[in-house]
């Protein structure tokens, strides 16, 4: 059985024991997090939707980390204008404990 959850404005397809990286949340390592499930799938028919908007997914915070650096480079030709800016998004690594 798997579920579709939303965290940080993005949707993730998860099963039990999956590890996912989501946008920064205000949680500490080892804390349990409850994510609202958009839809839960499974059962005898692979495409059957079991529950909509009524189940939840429980996950544990494994680590906090940062994503790879993204470089933003701005340039105006013939004006000697160049700007190089980097950004690293902070992430939270979650391990799914229970679906449904």
From Swiss-Prot:
**A single GO cellular-component term on record:** ribosome
The protein's GO terms of the molecular function aspect are: rRNA binding; structural constituent of ribosome
Entry annotated with the keyword Ribosomal protein: yes
Q: Where does the sequence pass through the membrane?
A: none
Keywords, alphabetical? Ribonucleoprotein, Ribosomal protein, RNA-binding, rRNA-binding
User: Which InterPro entries does the UniProt record give?
Assistant: bL21-like, bL21-like_sf, Ribosomal_bL21
Q: Please, which domain of life does this record's source organism belong to?
A: Bacteria
Give an example GO biological process: translation
Q: Which HAMAP family match?
A: Ribosomal_bL21 (MF_01363)
Binding partners and assembly: Part of the 50S ribosomal subunit. Contacts protein L20.
Q: What does this protein do?
A: This protein binds to 23S rRNA in the presence of protein L20.
Name the protein family. Answer: Belongs to the bacterial ribosomal protein bL21 family.
This chain belongs to the protein called Large ribosomal subunit protein bL21
- Recite the lineage of the species: Bacteria, Pseudomonadati, Pseudomonadota, Alphaproteobacteria, Rickettsiales
């Amino acid at each position: 059985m798997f579920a579709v959850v939303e965290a940080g404005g993005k949707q993730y397809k998860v099963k039990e024991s999956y590890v996912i990286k989501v946008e920064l949340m205000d949680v500490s390592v080892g804390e349990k997090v409850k994510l609202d499930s958009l839809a839960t799938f499974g059962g005898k028919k692979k495409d059957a939707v079991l529950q909509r908007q009524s189940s939840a997914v429980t996950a544990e915070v494994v680590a906090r980390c940062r994503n790879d650096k993204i470089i933003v480079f701005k340039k105006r030709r013939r004006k000697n204008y160049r700007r190089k800016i980097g950004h690293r998004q902070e992430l939270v690594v979650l391990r799914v404990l229970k679906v449904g």
